Amino acid sequence: MVSLQVSPLSQTLILAFLLPQALPAGVFELQIHSFGPGPGLGTPRSPCNARGPCRLFFRVCLKPGVSQEATESLCALGAALSTSVPVYTEHPGESAAALPLPDGLVRVPFRDAWPGTFSLVIETWREQLGEHAGGPAWNLLARVVGRRRLAAGGPWARDVQRTGTWELHFSYRARCEPPAVGAACARLCRSRSAPSRCGPGLRPCTPFPDECEAPSVCRPGCSPEHGYCEEPDECRCLEGWTGPLCTVPVSTSSCLNSRVPGPASTGCLLPGPGPCDGNPCANGGSCSETSGSFECACPRGFYGLRCEVSGVTCADGPCFNGGLCVGGEDPDSAYVCHCPPGFQGSNCEKRVDRCSLQPCQNGGLCLDLGHALRCRCRAGFAGPRCEHDLDDCAGRACANGGTCVEGGGSRRCSCALGFGGRDCRERADPCASRPCAHGGRCYAHFSGLVCACAPGYMGVRCEFAVRPDGADAVPAAPRGLRQADPQRFLLPPALGLLVAAGLAGAALLVIHVRRRGPGQDTGTRLLSGTREPSVHTLPDALNNLRLQDGAGDGPSSSADWNHPEDGDSRSIYVIPAPSIYAREDWLIQVLF
């Protein structure tokens, strides 16, 4: 049996060569912001069932390609599980709120070059806790699967996904681990450059700036000063240097056509290759030399150092939430997303608070249901945006001669005398407020209230006092004076004469209009059994009278009136007959 002996120096060299190959090219990072019920998706219960509290974990799976792969396929690019997730402590059966995850970072390392196109699978798992958990300890609560395009080294991309009644908010990015760099993490950091010496007829020598501080993983022996690499086990020379390890300087010699001397003066060599020799730009990109290096001008739809990463197109479905994808007019943009109402962002990934625009009119309440916008209108308004003012009085009239008045989205009834309430269906006593002053008696009339004044008082509400001895009258009692208040106020002589003259003129006009001869009286007849009215006897004769049931109505019908029984306090409504005012002497007696 032959044993293989490896010296310590050889072991060191082998480890130095293999160790960089085991380092990850980069890492995919996913930050979970919140997990909870989504708007308009129902009211989910707590993720913990009735067996006790639980804890949520998130599993991230990365698969190559842009096609929708089966969820059972392997996570070829890598997978990871979240850690340090807080315990969900809501009581079972209660509505679930959004679960914030301050430490919800999931890291998925990848060893090969980042493909740029991949499928992202995010699974939410529930771990049941407590002594009475029972059953399986782990249960799959939700799964999100989507296609993505992403270049390494770019900013965080934010996304919102819904599944069932749950909504997941997260961000993700891909970044390279040193010494890998580039959009695909396939280019390794070149070693530190140094000034070089260039001879006449050769390309100008400009040292490369340092691209990173990590050690080189180039071909063993590659000059750290004059060589660099973009792939493992590679050694590419800077301007002015040549050879397999970039250790042979290019100097001036007798060689023609820009050739340089070979090793040990065995011949002439061509100058070192230029950065754009062979066109390192892929997918039709054009190369240009810049300070000893090169830059690729990529065609539309590609990016990266060598245009090796394919850009996102509308065929990949980059627009979320129903956004419409069209080809971008900007040559640097492969697509443009036209977002539906309620969403914004380059990929329509951000939700807009549509209620902040106040779409509901006339004080309506705005409700954003996620898939639609609803307005809850106030009473008296209708329409999708509460823009229609309804006729509040349509189809609903006021009773007993009341008039409907609308305004401000509501309606009210202006009731006739003797009625009240919302629809004028309730009897009202107009004399309940005792409007007649100085002991005057109140009676209800079809045209308003009638006050029968006590001796020595006059006016619509018995507000004027007249002294019997002819002294100056006093002015009306102040507002709010009670009927039983014995206080009196005198009118000035000039004002008293003016009032008397005005009343006399009004009386003559009434006499002229109202006066009729015998047989011409078509108004309501005098109540049976009453005496000829006078200033004092008329109110007493009409007081506390009641119309019997079944009495006729109309201006020419006669009615029998009786005195009510004791304890009857119903209001009396009297329509005076025109014959009451037919005597001139009575009118003059009342006025004067």
UniProtKB/Swiss-Prot annotation:
Which Pfam families does its entry note?
EGF, hEGF, MNNL
Q: Which SUPFAM superfamilies match?
A: EGF/Laminin, Growth factor receptor domain
Query: Which N-terminal stretch is annotated as signal sequence?
Result: 1-32
The record's GO molecular-function terms, alphabetically, read:
calcium ion binding; Notch binding
Q: What are the boundaries of the region Disordered?
A: 548-567
Which cysteines does the record link by disulfide bonds?
C218-C229, C222-C235, C237-C246, C276-C287, C281-C296, C298-C307, C314-C325, C319-C337, C339-C348, C355-C366, C360-C375, C377-C386, C393-C404, C398-C413, C415-C424, C431-C442, C436-C451, C453-C462
Tissue specificity, please? Predominantly expressed in the neuroectoderm and paraxial mesoderm during embryogenesis.
Q: What is known of its domains?
A: The DSL domain is required for binding to the Notch receptor.
Disorder noted: A truncating mutation in Dll3 is the cause of the pudgy (pu) phenotype. Pudgy mice exhibit patterning defects at the earliest stages of somitogenesis. Adult pudgy mice present severe vertebral and rib deformities.
Subunit structure as annotated in this protein's UniProt entry: Can bind and activate Notch-1 or another Notch receptor.
Protein's name in the database: Delta-like protein 3
**Protein source organism:** Mus musculus
Name the gene behind this protein: Dll3
